[in-house]
Curated annotation (Swiss-Prot):
L-aspartate binds at residues 172, 218, 449, 490. Its main location: cytoplasm. One of its GO terms (molecular function) is aspartate-tRNA ligase activity. GO terms for cellular component: cytoplasm. Catalyzes the attachment of L-aspartate to tRNA(Asp) in a two-step reaction: L-aspartate is first activated by ATP to form Asp-AMP and then transferred to the acceptor end of tRNA(Asp). This is Aspartate--tRNA ligase.
Length: 589
């Protein structure tokens, strides 16, 4: 027997028992007559000690290094009262070593567990980094989340059904990872960006409640919360309304937070996309932050200040203000930094006004734009924003998208900088009623979610007549500013699906080539269906309290989509490429 107990499970009830432990040497203290070691496994740490009276054991112990892998056999004894360590779960006991087996000693480590290592070092030696307590706890939490989800789904009648990994490239918003076919030379499979079409086909097959915890792949630029391969909790249902799907999934997340964090998230508020963008400048608003954007175009549309009046009177313009309580203490340097920050989002400047004394009229206002705005305008601004003495107002005026993005980002930054965002709170919500389409950089229409999302209360002819005004029957779950899940009611009418493809500029030939199987399937008694997908990585990131998604994935990629440990991606063997009928235009190094 290699192990009788996990290290972290030993306690006073085991005193007097003989135990066999297997794990790693965490720390070593040589006190001359005794050598004390902390032995670690996935469940925790326990202290063991060697007595010099046993020369053989003592000699072995003196040659061990940190992170050596060992087996310890010994007797559990109670610590003296003065030696109890309340900071250790096993701090009331220790193990007198009676035998030791060294599975493998360790060389000098390339990581220092007692200090912060660079992320590059951590990813290169990931197998060592995962031995750290925090990382081990993150992965254990992830495993418990997936176990919880499987139990919940099983209890609610869902079937876990696998869908293909090698599939057909379809336009879903990001670039595909392609896999060449050896048998069908010149042809490629695509790794799925999501199981979207397959889960809809399962609904057409009669499996009315499907779920899968599944790997997905997107070849896109990475961020702190994005990876080229990620894991979804994928869900699809038939004969349920959007409201019923949301209720079912809200209950799952509510129950998960209770299970993992003992936190009651309460009832999730529902907010329209328009409301979220208007008040928070984001379709995933962080409601822990009390700051809100206030539109003032009607107040400033007639002022003799082109920076304000032009966007205030433009169809695609927006003028808004962000009130920051007690913000008048901000220095000019800080304000300049915020001006540079909004420029990242295309803003040409950042007007501001400090409210020093409301009762003093214009003399109580400090602002570089005060000369363009009279007392009547400022009084209207103060009334609408409920500004108080000591506040500062930041103004955004430009095209709607620029102002919304810039002021939304500024809201978040100021919330963090001035500690206005409650880091201890949990603020979930649903965002609904998204636009069905948006315009890309060239003015063409694209699907805001994906082209299989149904519109709200429109016939195909009505949708075709004015697509830009169409509202999608879509919904996103947002927690603390992160989109943790998103879904929609799907199109189940072949005419509606063809109408959407036409609006997106997909001609009939491409429709048949890329989606012919779907259009055919829609003709044979397709049920109404709706679904949702959660990002497992992002959920785990929130529950564990980390801000880096790589901390909740065992072997993640860098922001350059590379694995530093295995050195993937790598060049392929020329002979293999020849078998695949592939020729590269890049010379191998």
């Amino acid at each position: 027997m290699m192990r009788s107990h996990y290290c972290g499970t030993l306690n006073r009830s085991h005193v007097g028992q003989a135990v066999t432990l297997s794990g790693w040497v965490h720390r070593i203290r040589n006190l001359g007559r005794f050598i004390f070691m902390q032995i670690r496994d996935r469940e925790g740490i326990v202290q063991v000690f060697f007595d010099e009276k046993d020369d053989t054991l003592f000699k072995v112990a003196s040659q061990l290094r940190a992170e050596a892998c060992v087996q310890i056999q010994g007797q559990v004894i109670a610590r003296d009262e003065a030696q109890i360590n309340p900071e250790m779960a096993t701090g009331e006991i220790e193990v007198l070593v009676q035998n030791v087996l060294v599975y493998n000693n360790a060389e000098v480590l390339p990581l220092d567990f007692n200090q912060n290592n660079t992320e590059e070092q951590r990813l290169k030696y990931r197998y060592l980094d995962l031995r750290r307590h925090k990382m081990a706890e993150n992965l254990k939490t992830r495993a418990k989340i997936t176990s919880f989800v499987r139990r919940y789904m099983d209890e609610h009648g869902f079937l876990d059904i696998e869908t293909p990994m090698l599939t057909k490239a379809t336009p879903e918003g990001a670039r595909d990872y392609l896999v060449p076919s050896r048998v069908h030379k010149g042809k490629f499979y695509a790794l799925p960006q999501s199981p979207q079409l397959f889960k809809q086909l399962l609904m057409m097959s009669g499996f009315d409640r499907y779920y899968q915890i599944v790997k997905c792949f997107r070849d896109e630029d990475l961020r702190a919360d994005r990876q080229p391969e990620f894991t979804q909790i994928d869900v699809e249902t038939s004969f349920l309304t959007a409201e019923e799907v949301r209720a079912l999934m809200e209950n799952m997340i509510h129950s998960l937070w209770l299970d993992r964090l003992n936190v009651d998230l309460g009832k999730f508020p529902i907010m329209s996309w328009q409301e979220a963008m208007q008040h928070f400048g984001s379709d995933k608003p962080d409601l822990r932050n009390p700051l809100e954007l206030v539109d003032i175009a009607d107040i400033v549309k007639n002022v003799e200040f082109n920076v304000f009046n032009e966007p205030a009177n433009a169809i695609d313009g927006r003028v808004t203000v962000l009130r920051v309580p007690n913000g008048a203490t901000l220095t000019r340097k800080q304000i300049d930094e915020y001006t540079q920050f909004v420029a990242i989002y295309g803003a040409k400047g950042l007007a501001w006004a400090k409210i020093n004394d409301i009762n003093a009229g214009m003399d109580g206002i400090q602002s570089p734009v005060a000369k363009f705005l009279n007392a009547e305008i400022f009084n209207a601004l103060i009334e609408r924003t409920a500004a108080q003495n000591g506040d500062i107002l930041f103004f955004g005026a430009d095209k709607w998208q620029v102002v919304t993005d810039a002021m939304g980002a500024l809201r978040l930054k100021i919330g963090r900088d001035l500690a206005l965002t409650d880091q201890t709170a949990w603020k979930p919500l649903w965002v609904i009623d998204f636009p069905m389409f948006e315009r890309d950089g060239e003015g063409n229409l694209s699907a805001m979610h994906h082209p299989f999302t149904a519109p709200k209360d429109l016939s195909p002819d009505q949708l075709a007549a004015d697509p830009i005004k169409a509202v999608a029957n879509a919904y996103d779950m947002v927690i603390n500013g992160y989109e943790v899940g998103g879904g929609s009611v799907r199109i189940f009418d072949p005419k509606m699906q063809q109408t959407v493809f036409n609006i997106l500029g997909i001609n009939e030939q491409d429709q048949q080539e890329k989606f012919g199987f779907l259009l055919d399937a829609l003709k044979f008694g397709t049920p109404p269906h709706a679904g949702l997908a959660f990002g497992l990585d992002r959920l785990t990131m929130l529950i564990t309290g980390t801000e880096n998604i790589r901390d909740v994935i065992a072997f993640p990629k860098t922001t350059a989509a590379a694995c530093l440990m295995t050195e993937a991606p790598s060049y392929a063997n020329p002979q293999v490429l020849q078998e695949l009928a592939i020729q590269t235009t890049v010379e191998t190094e």
